[in-house]
């Protein structure tokens, strides 16, 4: 599993996805990210993600993003866990 620090992320690398719930994301936004709650992402990844693009997943503490990164990586997606 690929892991990078948030400080090393740059927008040209791929899409930064904040997988926290919408309330947490709105109260404490992560600069440069789009919010897709992890449950929604896991239920709809086939229609929401493109296997030819890079995605960087981030959450509050790193546990959920690590878990979701592993799952999506298993299904062949180019995903990286982002830690703060």
Features from the language model and the residues they span:
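Generic alpha-helical hydrophobic packing signal
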Residues: 3, 42-45, 84
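Short amphipathic alpha-helical segments and helix-helix/interface helices
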Residues: 6-10, 46, 69
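A short helix-to-beta-strand connector/capping loop
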Residues: 12, 31-32, 77
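Flexible, polar/low-complexity N-terminal or interdomain linker segments that lie immediately upstream
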Residues: 1-28, 38
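Alpha-helical elements of the RecA-like P-loop NTPase motor core of helicases
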Residues: 26-27, 43, 66-70
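Structural signal for short hydrophobic segments within the conserved structured cores
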Residues: 15, 34-36, 80
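Helix-loop module immediately N-terminal to the HCX5R catalytic loop
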Residues: 32-56
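Catalytic cysteine-centered active loop of the rhodanese-like fold, especially the PTP/DSP P-loop
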Residues: 48-84
């Amino acid at each position: 599993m690929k892991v990078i620090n948030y400080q090393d992320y740059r927008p040209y690398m791929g899409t930064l996805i904040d997988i926290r719930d919408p309330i947490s994301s709105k109260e404490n936004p992560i600069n440069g990210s789009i919010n897709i709650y992890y449950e929604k992402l896991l239920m709809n990844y086939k229609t929401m993600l493109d296997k030819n693009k890079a995605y960087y997943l981030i959450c509050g503490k790193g546990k959920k993003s690590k878990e979701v990164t592993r799952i999506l990586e298993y299904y062949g997606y180019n995903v990286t866990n982002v830690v703060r």
